[in-house]
Amino acid sequence: MSFVTVKGLNIHYEKSGRKGKKVLLLHGWGQNTEMMAYIADFLKKHFIVYNLDFPGFGESEEPKEAWSNEDYVDFLHEFVEINKINNPILIGHSFGCRVALYYAYKYPVYKMALTGAAGIIAPHDLEWYLKVYTYKAGKILLKPFKNLSKKLQSNAGSEDYKNASPVLKGTLVKCVNFDITPYLKDIKPETLLIYGDKDEATPIWMGKKMEELMPNATLITFEGDDHFAYIHQPDRFNRVLEAYLKSDYD
């Protein structure tokens, strides 16, 4: 467990691997490093992996005021500079993809793999976003993640949105009202988009639109799965990553 000060906040992250290109794992809303830990374990043989808690989540300090999507991008850039990372590979889920996409618009990125990517505005209210972006009742995860599911239940789900701090509620309002669509045509890194075709939080039409507008994006679907397909099918997800990143192995 490591901590570093970024934008004046105490930030938790886990670093693994000793050689290779550098990968940043960016979790979804209401989640933390644990959600991406199995990906880090898989990739650390060939990459240097940074798995971080966004400000306001996990073990990282909460911002003093509501942040926008751009604030999170600025945070990520400062983290990258502190750790002397050049042209990172970004792997994200949901909210993490929202940050990754705008980061790739503003700063150099080598490649991205984005699952359940958020960023295109959908006609929903705040309460809906808070419900679908966090785990409800712990019934989403399959057996390999039962222990993780219990941990998440204590901090997420139907009660979490009611008890979320004013800062995080304000943050979510700002972030979900930021539309990445006008920037997609200028996001040039090779990007793999992975969506469950039953995703209700970020419906597959969003992935199709991103694939259409981004010059180097490819969309694949996990049939019959939802917004958390990467957790429901971890082995399949890692095999997809392996095929996508194998040419970059150290």
Outline where the language-model segments fall.
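Conserved HGGG/HGGXW glycine-rich cap/lid loop of the alpha/beta-hydrolase fold
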Residues: L9, E14-E59
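Catalytic histidine-centered segment of alpha/beta-hydrolase-like enzymes
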Residues: D225-P234, N238
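Flexible "cap/lid" loop of the alpha/beta hydrolase fold
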Residues: R98-K143
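Active-site loop/oxyanion-hole signature of alpha/beta-hydrolase fold enzymes
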Residues: E14, N51-I91, R239
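Conserved alpha/beta-hydrolase catalytic His-Asp/Glu region
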Residues: D125-P189
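Alpha/beta-hydrolase fold catalytic core
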Residues: M1-V23, K44-F47, I85-N86, Y110, ...
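Short alpha-helix in the alpha/beta-hydrolase fold that links the catalytic acid
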Residues: P189, P203-M210
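Short beta-strand/loop motif that positions the catalytic acidic residue
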Residues: I187, L193-Y195, D199
